[in-house]
């Protein structure tokens, strides 16, 4: 996790409680199996990290983790809360999409993560 943390810090993440929560969430799900309709594959170092550095996206198993829909949203929320500059802007675009899709502010969705999890499962079936 230290390597991931250092790379995230190098593109403008702040070492705050949300970065720690993000890294903990990733570590806690390291062995989560892919489950049809119930999980999302998440890039630990986000795709925008590589785009900001003009590098090819790392799709290796070491940079991927399976997360429930609610944990996936939380992961991006935590990244947003520790990001700065272009990295923060790129993360905020994902939230605008989710807010538009469910017609709720992201804060309301975060408060009701269990409902979000079920909405995602239902939408994929």
Regions found by a protein language model. Name each.
Residues 1, 12-15, 68, 109, ...:
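Intrinsic-disorder-associated interaction segments
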Residues 1-40, 75:
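Short cysteine-rich loop/turn motifs with clustered Cys
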Residues 11-14, 25-29, 85, 101, ...:
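Surface-exposed polar/charged interaction patches
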Residues 28-67:
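Histidine-centered nuclease catalytic patch
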Residues 64-89:
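Short Cys/His-centered divalent metal-binding micro-motifs
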Residues 84-104:
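N-terminal accessory alpha/beta regions
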Residues 101-125:
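Secondary-structure boundary/linker elements at domain or insertion junctions
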């Amino acid at each position: 996790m230290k390597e991931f943390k250092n790379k995230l810090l190098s593109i403008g993440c702040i070492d705050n409680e949300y970065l720690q929560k993000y890294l903990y969430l990733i570590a806690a799900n390291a062995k989560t199996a892919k489950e049809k309709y119930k999980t999302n594959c998440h890039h630990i170092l986000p795709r925008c990290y590589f785009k900001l550095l003009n590098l090819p996206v790392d799709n290796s198993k070491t940079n991927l983790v399976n997360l429930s829909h609610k944990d996936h949203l939380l992961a991006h929320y935590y990244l947003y809360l520790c990001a700065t500059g272009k990295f923060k802007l790129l993360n905020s675009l994902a939230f605008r999409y989710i807010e538009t899709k469910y017609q709720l502010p992201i804060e309301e969705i975060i408060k009701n993560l269990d409902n979000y999890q079920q909405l995602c499962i239902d939408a994929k079936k």
